[in-house]
């Protein structure tokens, strides 16, 4: 109940939090569970998880482990991943700053080449974080947790990749 004297406050994500804390500041329900189950061949049931971070991570890890089985290239995998995230955040009242899909055509590697790639990027507290379940393929360790949130300013950023596009420059992060 909100009286005429009350003000409803929206949640804004604080900037000094970890990615986990920032994702958990975004309240999500299970309304997208059916869609996510369909997109993941029944592999992810977000209703089993309590926090937004755990739901998000389950979707991420499923894609990282199963993209080869489905014969997906980067674009196919990330299109499906983005569909899952869109379903997860559908009723979150956009408490994150913005949710964008970065298309491969707008992106350049630091050597000028164009990767055939696509990401889900979420602005949390004004900073872009790219969540890409396939980026672990660029490292020697193929575990799905090699990369989770990609943010600007990591120690290893310049040694690996710099991505440029209309939204700014993105640096991979651990």
PLM ranges: what are they?
Residues 152-174:
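Low-complexity, Gly/Ser/Thr/Pro-rich intrinsically disordered linker/tail segments
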Residues 5, 12-13, 41, 140, ...:
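N-terminal compositionally biased, intrinsically disordered segments and leader/signal-like regions
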Residues 79-155:
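Hydrophobic/aromatic-rich core segments of domains that either
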Residues 32, 42-43, 94, 112, ...:
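Intrinsic-disorder/low-complexity loop/linker signature
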């Amino acid at each position: 109940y909100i009286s005429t004297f009350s003000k409803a406050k929206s949640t804004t994500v604080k900037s000094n939090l970890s990615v986990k804390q920032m994702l958990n500041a975004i309240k999500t329900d299970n309304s997208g569970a059916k869609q996510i189950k369909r997109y993941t061949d029944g592999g992810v049931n977000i209703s089993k998880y309590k926090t937004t971070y755990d739901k998000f991570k389950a979707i991420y890890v499923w894609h990282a482990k199963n993209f080869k089985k489905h014969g997906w290239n980067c674009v196919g995998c990330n299109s499906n991943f983005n569909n899952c995230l869109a379903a997860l955040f559908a009723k979150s009242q956009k408490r994150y700053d913005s949710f964008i899909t970065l298309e491969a055509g707008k992106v350049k590697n630091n050597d000028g080449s164009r990767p055939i790639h696509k990401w889900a990027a979420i602005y949390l507290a004004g900073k872009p974080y790219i969540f890409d379940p396939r980026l672990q393929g660029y490292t020697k360790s193929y575990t799905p947790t090699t990369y989770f949130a990609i943010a600007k300013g990591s120690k290893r950023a310049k040694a690996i990749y710099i991505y440029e596009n209309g939204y700014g420059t993105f640096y991979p992060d651990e």
